[in-house]
Design a protein with these regions (language model features):
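Bacterial Sec-dependent N-terminal signal peptides
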Residues: 1-24
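Tryptophan-paired
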Residues: 44-85
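Extracytoplasmic electrostatic interaction patches
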Residues: 75-157
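Noncatalytic modules at the cell exterior or secretory-pathway interfaces
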Residues: 17-29, 72-83
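Calcium-regulated, polybasic anionic-phospholipid
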Residues: 28-54
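Exposed beta-strand and adjacent loop surfaces of beta-rich binding modules
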Residues: 20-22, 36-40, 97-103
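Intrinsic-disorder/low-complexity, polar/charged segments enriched in Ser/Thr/Lys/Arg/Asp/Glu/Gln
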Residues: 20-22, 59-63, 78, 147-151
């Protein structure tokens, strides 16, 4: 008679099933974005109310482990970042080149019951087309108003 190390009274656990999900978000933006825009990131899971943070000069990074100690892994993770022109804008120097660049990375990693991890989704982007904007184009860019940087969601399967 042989007994398993973790006991026979436990329910059978599927080793490949996810027991938690780690989500990494990061945003890095140029100083001009921070000077001219308010950048707000909202993030969360499923249909829960979003958490909101402001992105500053140092950027914004968040790592969240969903599912640990919870009865289930979330069905969906999401993150949305919006930049809105500030109410009080700095003076635009028409001779200067401006950079309205925002880089972001988002990774969703599944942690399985057997201890293995798997990448469920990876997203990264940069917008180099607005890295060298002439000063005489800045007001036109600001007049676009609120801009969505990213609207990301991923269903966990």
């Amino acid at each position: 008679f042989f007994a398993s190390c973790d006991g026979n009274d436990k329910e059978d656990v599927n080793p490949a099933e996810l027991n938690s999900v780690i989500v990494n978000y990061s945003f890095i933006q140029s100083d001009d974005v921070v000077d001219f825009y308010d950048v707000i990131v909202s993030y969360g899971i499923d249909e829960e109310e979003a958490n909101c943070d402001t992105v500053g000069f140092d950027g914004w990074t968040m790592e969240i482990n969903y599912g640990v100690g919870e009865p289930t892994v979330p069905n969906k993770v999401y993150c949305k970042a919006i930049m809105t022109p500030k109410a009080q804008l700095p003076t635009i120097d028409l001779e200067k080149k401006y950079s309205f660049k925002v880089d972001y990375n988002m990774n969703v990693i599944g942690c399985r019951n057997d201890g293995q991890t798997t990448i469920l989704k990876m997203v990264s982007n940069t917008n180099p087309n607005i890295a060298n904007m002439p000063g005489n184009k800045v007001q036109e860019y600001l007049d676009k108003g609120e801009q969505i940087i990213v609207d990301f969601s991923h269903e966990i399967k």
